[in-house]
Amino acid sequence: MVMNIRVLTPDRVICSTTADEVVLPGLTGQVGVLDGHAALITALETGLLRIKLNDKWTPIILCGGLAEIDRDRVTVLVNDVEELTDIGLSEATQELEKATLAVENAKTSKERLDASVELKKATARLEAVNYLS
């Protein structure tokens, strides 16, 4: 059985497709969704959304939001998404190291918060590269 998934930002539809399985970046960990899942609304962390169809995973980097799950339909509402570019494994690893150092060297709460968001994005980028390679 397949389910429908839509990923939306305030200004556009990122994707509208079918999926065999969806894995969402929830605030308390990953949320796996299969067809027939119980109704649920959950907050999403900045991280990697994975959509599986015909044994192929498609990653999308989300920048926070929420998801509504209802049996055979998943609607993901996010603030923004980060486009996946042709980034290699070594570049993604370097970005993760740079983001980790920025968190460690942050001097103010705002710097730490901004660096933490960038660290989450860098982690999601590295995960996405691993799924695409």
From Swiss-Prot:
PANTHER family: ATP SYNTHASE DELTA/EPSILON CHAIN, ATP SYNTHASE EPSILON CHAIN, CHLOROPLASTIC
Molecular function in Gene Ontology: ATP binding; proton-transporting ATP synthase activity, rotational mechanism
CDD domains, per the entry: F1-ATPase_delta
Similarity section: Belongs to the ATPase epsilon chain family.
Location(s), subcellular: Plastid, Chloroplast thylakoid membrane
Entries under SUPFAM superfamilies matching the protein: Epsilon subunit of F1F0-ATP synthase N-terminal domain
Natural source organism: Phaeodactylum tricornutum (strain CCAP 1055/1)
NCBIfam families: ATP_synt_epsi
Quaternary structure and interacting proteins, as annotated: F-type ATPases have 2 components, CF(1) - the catalytic core - and CF(0) - the membrane proton channel. CF(1) has five subunits: alpha(3), beta(3), gamma(1), delta(1), epsilon(1). CF(0) has three main subunits: a, b and c.
Alphabetically ordered keywords of this record: ATP synthesis, CF(1), Chloroplast, Hydrogen ion transport, Ion transport, Membrane, Plastid, Thylakoid, Transport
A single GO cellular-component term on record: chloroplast thylakoid membrane
Protein's recorded name: ATP synthase epsilon chain, chloroplastic
Pfam families, A to Z: ATP-synt_DE, ATP-synt_DE_N
Keyword Cell cycle part of the UniProt annotation: no
Its biological purpose: Produces ATP from ADP in the presence of a proton gradient across the membrane.
High-level lineage: Eukaryota, Sar, Stramenopiles, Ochrophyta, Bacillariophyta
Gene3D superfamilies found in the cross-reference section: 6.10.140.480, F0F1 ATP synthase delta/epsilon subunit, N-terminal (2.60.15.10)
HAMAP family on file: ATP_synth_epsil_bac
Disulphide-bonded residues: none
Main localization category: plastid
